[in-house]
Amino acid sequence: MKQLLKDSWWNQLKDEFDKPYYQELREMLKQEYSSQTIYPDSHDIFNALHYTPYEDVKAVILGQDPYHGPGQAHGLSFSVQPGVRQPPSLKNIFIELQDDIGCSVPNHGSLVSWAKQGVLLLNTVLTVRRGQANSHKGKGWERLTDRIIDVVNEREKPIVFILWGRHAQMKKERIDTSKHIIIESTHPSPFSARNGFFGSRPFSRTNAALEKMGEQPIDWCIPDLPQ
């Protein structure tokens, strides 16, 4: 099969792409992309893995499925493309970021700068139909993204897993807590942010954990883009 990922992830995951479930998922996606409006663009599906090589992962922020509005999703959990209005959950993430470590709120919603520093921004489902949340749930993506979580968990080097909300916290059973750190709270969505997300200080706590491991902390402050 054609190599879909850069070497570091391909070496970990290539066997998955030959399995029957992935072949079925691939056929479904071919039909969906040819007959429906699907997000993100097919070239962006694996951006979480393209921006953050396997050996560079320091932290994981798990999301659910991609944003389903025009121009939003680009393959990174919680992130939107520059020039697109920040969705409510992302606005709340930036409020907590400001309260936690004093970063000013950026003039865009792209989290690429985090991904390039080793933050794996992984959704558990990697595609969605326009305007239909969870439309590709249960189609096979979860098996692949569970395997991604597993190969990260298998690494010797400790990692910080940031789990916001029940959906992400269901993955706790896949994480070896004798080796890795879990930081969790409610989801940053407007429905739950005030019930434990605000004030949870995930960014400073992640950096404190990384420094304790002897790792470079993450510069969470996101630079503004030129207007």
From Swiss-Prot:
PROSITE patterns: U_DNA_GLYCOSYLASE. Its EC number is 3.2.2.27. SMART domains: UDG, UreE_C. It is an enzyme of class 3 (hydrolase). Keywords: Cytoplasm, DNA damage, DNA repair, Hydrolase. GO terms for molecular function: uracil DNA N-glycosylase activity. It catalyses: Hydrolyzes single-stranded DNA or mismatched double-stranded DNA and polynucleotides, releasing free uracil. One of its GO terms (cellular component) is cytoplasm. It is found in: Cytoplasm. InterPro entries: UDG_fam1, Ura-DNA_Glyclase_AS, Uracil-DNA_glycosylase-like, Uracil-DNA_glycosylase-like_sf. The active site is at D65. GO terms for biological process: base-excision repair, AP site formation via deaminated base removal. Belongs to the uracil-DNA glycosylase (UDG) superfamily. UNG family. Excises uracil residues from the DNA which can arise as a result of misincorporation of dUMP residues by DNA polymerase or due to deamination of cytosine. HAMAP family: UDG (MF_00148). This is Uracil-DNA glycosylase. It comes from Bacillus velezensis (strain DSM 23117 / BGSC 10A6 / LMG 26770 / FZB42).
